[in-house]
Amino acid sequence: MGNTIRAFVAFIPTDRCQSYVVGDLREMPLDRMVDLSGSQLRRFPLHVCSFTELVKLYLSDNHLHSLPPDLAQLQNLQILALDFNNFKALPRVVCTLKQLCILYLGNNKLCDLPDELSLLQNLRTLWLESNCLTRLPDVVCELSLLKTLHAGSNALRLLPGQLRRLRELRTIWLSGNQLADFPSVLLRMPFLEVIDVDRNSIRYFPSLAHLTNLKLVIYDHNPCRNAPKVGKGVRRVGRWAEETPEPDPRKARRYALAKEENQEPPPPLLPSSS
């Protein structure tokens, strides 16, 4: 019986189906939150735009590819979830919601972000994971209050040098990209607390010991020849994470000599397992 009902709903024309799903949502919820996640929406229900005091709007896991201009009426919105949809471009109306603090855009088909995103100067958290980004859009570097950036599972090869302007940034997730080298800009961001570069193509890690606020670095599933050196109390997740981060003097000398001769450094000397 349940399968029959699901099959019936699946074949209701789009407008009727949306009425069926959100038909009871006619008044502003007392908690100022609307959650339409997983509602099979193909078009945004316009009457939600009349809830001008709305603070949280969850539209995750639908079939949306556009948003109406009327969304600009939601000027009190602080959290907007658009992840797991079909957006190929971020609707510019989102950039008019200047009170946004958290924006979820993961699992879409985004290749870039509009310059207007810089208008969201209250944004603290931005999720861009599992899109089609081959570079981190420069506009991200203009979000001066950003504290958490999730850009994992894209096709990033480099990070822009301007990223160091984000002095409030504390957590950056870059797992599942195409980084061949540890991003040098991160070495100039001593305020970072969490760095995740899991599942990339990084072969050598520079010392991170000077990043005095660092608490966690995740570097597993890289073809690395060494573990990153970190300060006392910093947790490492990855190969050789339990080994001492202090370099063996012999290894340091051999590495320096190989570098002078423009040769590939020899494999690191690891402590024996005994």
Swiss-Prot record:
Q: Which GO terms describe its cellular component?
A: cytoskeleton; mitochondrion; myofibril; nucleus; sarcomere
InterPro entries listed in its UniProt record: Leu-rich_rpt, Leu-rich_rpt_typical-subtyp, LRR_dom_sf, LRR_domain-containing
User: Which Gene Ontology BP terms does the record give?
Assistant: cardiac muscle cell development
Q: Where are the LRR repeats?
A: 30-51, 52-74, 76-97, 98-120, 121-143, 145-166, 167-189, 191-213
What keywords would UniProt list here?
A: Leucine-rich repeat, Nucleus, Repeat
Q: In which tissues is it expressed?
A: Detected specifically in the heart.
Q: Name one Pfam family in it.
A: LRR_8
Pro residues biased stretches: 264-274
SMART domains in UniProt: LRR_BAC (SM00364), LRR_TYP (SM00369)
The keyword Zinc is annotated on this UniProt entry: no
Q: Specify where the region named Disordered lies, as residue ranges.
A: 236-274
Signal peptide coordinates: none
What protein name does the entry list?
A: Leucine-rich repeat-containing protein 10
